[in-house]
Amino acid sequence: MRLIASSFLALALTGAIVTGPAHAADLIDFWDKPQHGGNSFNRLPPDEAYFKALSSYGATWVRLSYDKWKPAKRDYLIGDADKYEGIPAADLKTLKETLDRSDKAGLKVVITPLSLPGMRWSQNNGNKFDGRIWQDKAWWAEAASFWRDLARELKDHPGVAAYNIINEPAPEKQNGLAEHADEKAMQDWYASKKGSASDLVAFYETVIAAIREVDPATPIMADAGWYAAADAFNYWPSGLSDQKVLYSFHMYEPYAATSAPNMKREKPYAYPGKVPFGEGEQNWDKTRVASYLDQPVQWAKDKGIAPNRVVAGEFGCMRRWTGCKAYLEDVLTTLDKDSLHWAFYSFREDSWDGMDYELGSKKVHWKYWDAIDAGTPDPVKRSATPEFEPIAKRLAR
């Protein structure tokens, strides 16, 4: 795909671009009141029945990732994370058709890449972390080119509610800052990296500027660093300069308890209970959940950012973990207290059953795994369960 012609770029720089349809000007208004939805991280592009099922619970949006879909080249939509040369036409066609199905079901979509040029998602990279984009700004230019191209293609689609520039960035990883470090350590680290290729804030500004050359209206969703940790906005000196930005964090803390490895422990960490976190161990209960989740809300308040621009883009726990239902209830109680947007992880995932709450607390049927091996649609039927109840009852409100 060719990049912007010089004449078009000149129009962009002079502000002479004509906006798209009338709906474009109102896109940010969708986010003025709390919106609740789910994450779609499936290996096959979801069909209309999938989106209708999510909508039938009362969801209003879906955070859509496409990186598990079969790509035309090495990496879906970006062609090759090692060298961006345009969006493959076949990949774009499939994405647009999927957006049409979601729109028909009444769901807004947040476009969510797991990979960018210079940052291949670890699960598509032999489970190895790829942090090239945080080491060399040459990758920033390729990422900006990709997003400029994608925004040009999607800016007029009625189903798109935001562009989530990259899922769970981690410029801090293997780069001198411990996960869940204290606020001063975070701020000192950022001061030492400001202006470098590790500067997440500057990266976002660069990519947003490229998007705005072709699309002045679609909101941007920006994940915090350290895999979108709720405490990782703490080092940001301010919000981003664009006025149509949503600030997103993910909630799986304490990760040692909510994640898959805990299920393999002889005695899994319980909730409520003491769990490793950061450099030590902490007692996690509804009070600790609330205080942890207060951090992005307080950060936004301190920076003059409205609470309706803060999003819990993901949250969840292993459905077979005994503490999961109580954990979900406590997380959601806190999110709703602050009237935040949220999307649970995940809805009817066809490649991993760990946080698919409609499956209940039992092992999934063997035909689920057979379908994965065969590359065929997931045949397992879903229904509301007690494990899904904390989410379902709120979607229905």
Model-derived segments and their meaning:
Residues 42-55, 143-146, 289, 293-296:
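Short, acidic/polar
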Residues 70-90, 117-138, 173-189, 354-362:
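Surface-exposed, active-site-proximal loop segments in enzymatic domains
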Residues 123, 131-282, 294-318, 337-343:
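Active-site region of glycoside hydrolase catalytic domains
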Residues 25-49:
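Boundary/entry segment of secreted carbohydrate-active catalytic domains
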Residues 7-16:
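Bacterial N-terminal signal peptides
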Residues 48-121, 142, 200-215, 221, ...:
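Aromatic-lined substrate-binding rim segments of carbohydrate-active enzymes
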Residues 18-24:
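Sec/Tat signal peptide C-region and signal peptidase I cleavage site
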